[in-house]
């Protein structure tokens, strides 16, 4: 008689699974793969609740988020260096977003970022 199927882990979940080595008996941890998959999935469900995403598309979205993050971080770092500052503040991030993103997209990103920072500071 076939065994009942176990429930699959949530998409994008990151768990360190321990495996036992054959001869040595020592436990080995599987390396964690960090990704934005769970966050991309949450946003997708907010925008289109009945739509799914393939693993290939999720990989592309993960690469996209990593790329944008690196660009904003790099530009923010450059701005802080130009102004002889050792700290990247929300002001540097905002300016970097304005420089990197075109027109209306930058305006929306800045307003969403401001909203997120306001929500965070009010919750403290």
Curated annotation (Swiss-Prot):
Q: What does this protein do?
A: Core component of nucleosome. Nucleosomes wrap and compact DNA into chromatin, limiting DNA accessibility to the cellular machineries which require DNA as a template. Histones thereby play a central role in transcription regulation, DNA repair, DNA replication and chromosomal stability. DNA accessibility is regulated via a complex set of post-translational modifications of histones, also called histone code, and nucleosome remodeling.
Organism the protein comes from: Salmo trutta (Brown trout)
Indicate what this protein is called per its UniProt record: Histone H2B
PTM characteristics: Monoubiquitination of Lys-119 by BRE1 gives a specific tag for epigenetic transcriptional activation and is also prerequisite for histone H3 'Lys-4' and 'Lys-79' methylation. Phosphorylated during apoptosis; which facilitates apoptotic chromatin condensation.
Cite the InterPro entries for this sequence: Histone-fold, Histone_H2A/H2B/H3, Histone_H2B, HISTONE_H2B_site
Q: Where is this cross-link: Glycyl lysine isopeptide (Lys-Gly) (interchain with G-Cter in ubiquitin)?
A: 119
Keyword Isomerase set for record: no
Q: Gene3D superfamilies, from UniProt? A: Histone, subunit A
Q: Where is the signal peptide?
A: none
Q: Which UniProt keywords apply?
A: Acetylation, Chromosome, DNA-binding, Glycoprotein, Isopeptide bond, Nucleosome core, Nucleus, Phosphoprotein, Ubl conjugation
């Amino acid at each position: 008689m076939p065994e009942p199927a176990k429930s699959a882990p949530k998409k994008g979940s990151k768990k360190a699974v321990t495996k036992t080595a054959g001869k040595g008996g020592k436990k080995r941890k599987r390396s964690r793969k960090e990704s934005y998959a769970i966050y991309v999935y949450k946003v997708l469900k907010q925008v289109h609740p009945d739509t799914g995403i393939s693993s290939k598309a999720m990989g592309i979205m993960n690469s996209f988020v990593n790329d944008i993050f690196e660009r904003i971080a790099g530009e923010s770092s450059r701005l802080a260096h130009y102004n002889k500052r050792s700290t990247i503040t929300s002001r540097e991030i905002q300016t970097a977003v304005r420089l990197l993103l075109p027109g209306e997209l930058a305006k929306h990103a800045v307003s969403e970022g401001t909203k997120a920072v306001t929500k965070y500071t009010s919750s403290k």
